[in-house]
């Protein structure tokens, strides 16, 4: 599990090092420490919206008797610690910090968010084929729709906080903890309800994203991949170009 969820960040760091050397790695990691945006309201929105959406879906699922049940306190505390070091920290630097930043160099924030959301959703697809994963008990279409819609919301956060990855980490953590409140397996009613709620959030998020490419993408702090000569990139990796 840890290997899977940390793979986006590991790959992003590897690509940054290969193409840009240590400066690329420093630039990518700099997205974590670039300071909070002046518009701090978006950090609060990032925490409250996912949690409120998940809790609302849990309430609806429980009302409809779909089997949703809250976790015991001990399990909730364990899940809290687990989520700190898994999805939120393991994925966001790679998906939003690296890939979304580069997508926005050639695409509008709106189109980049859609491409990012679809890619991120499909990345979760193999979870349906591994025994013991909670996705095996969820409707695939609803789950993928939910993840893609949430990904669009994360793209909005990333842009509105000027590429501060901590904002999307907080939102991702809030979302995962919201799921934990209701337990890992909540039934199809819960997943479909959550997919519907986040679809509405995604529509509003797309409306707030620009439809036109910007000269300086919000999260961009390093040049496009491949801008350095091949020999320089090989030298950065301590390889002999000959």
Task: Give each language-model segment a name.
Residues 1-45, 60-73, 157-163, 206-220:
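Membrane-helix interface linkers and caps
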Residues 90-117, 159-164:
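Membrane-interface helix/loop boundary segments of multi-pass membrane proteins
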Residues 106, 110-135:
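Membrane-helix boundary elements
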Residues 6, 47, 80-85, 114-121, ...:
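Residue-level signature of the transmembrane alpha-helical core
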Residues 51-58, 118-127, 172-181:
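Aromatic-anchored segments of alpha-helical transmembrane domains
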Residues 214-237:
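Short, highly charged, low-complexity non-transmembrane loops/tails of multi-pass membrane proteins
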Residues 138-196:
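Functionally important transmembrane alpha-helices
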Residues 68-81, 132-145:
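Juxtamembrane helix-entry segments on the extracytoplasmic side of multipass membrane proteins
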């Amino acid at each position: 599990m840890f290997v899977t969820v940390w793979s986006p960040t590991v790959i992003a760091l590897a690509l940054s090092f290969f193409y840009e050397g240590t400066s690329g790695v420093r630039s990518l990691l700099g997205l974590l420490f670039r300071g909070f945006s002046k518009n701090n309201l978006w950090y609060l929105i990032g925490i409250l919206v996912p949690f409120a959406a998940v809790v609302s879906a849990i309430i609806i699922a429980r009302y409809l008797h779909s089997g949703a049940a809250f976790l015991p306190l001990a399990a909730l505390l364990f899940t809290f610690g687990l989520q700190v070091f898994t999805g939120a920290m393991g994925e966001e630097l790679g998906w939003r910090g690296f890939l979304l930043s580069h997508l926005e160099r050639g695409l509008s924030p709106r189109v980049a968010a859609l491409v990012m959301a679809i890619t991120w959703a499909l990345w979760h697809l193999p979870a349906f084929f591994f025994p013991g994963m909670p996705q095996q008990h969820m409707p695939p279409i609803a789950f993928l729709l939910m993840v893609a819609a949430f990904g669009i919301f994360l793209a909005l956060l990333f842009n509105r906080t000027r590429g501060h990855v901590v904002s999307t980490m907080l939102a991702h953590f809030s979302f995962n903890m919201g799921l934990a409140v209701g337990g890992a397996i909540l039934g199809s009613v819960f997943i479909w309800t959550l997919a519907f709620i986040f679809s509405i959030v995604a529509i509003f998020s797309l409306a707030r994203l620009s439809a036109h490419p910007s000269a300086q993408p919000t999260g961009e702090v390093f040049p496009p991949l491949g801008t350095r000569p091949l020999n320089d990139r090989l030298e950065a990796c301590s390889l002999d170009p000959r």
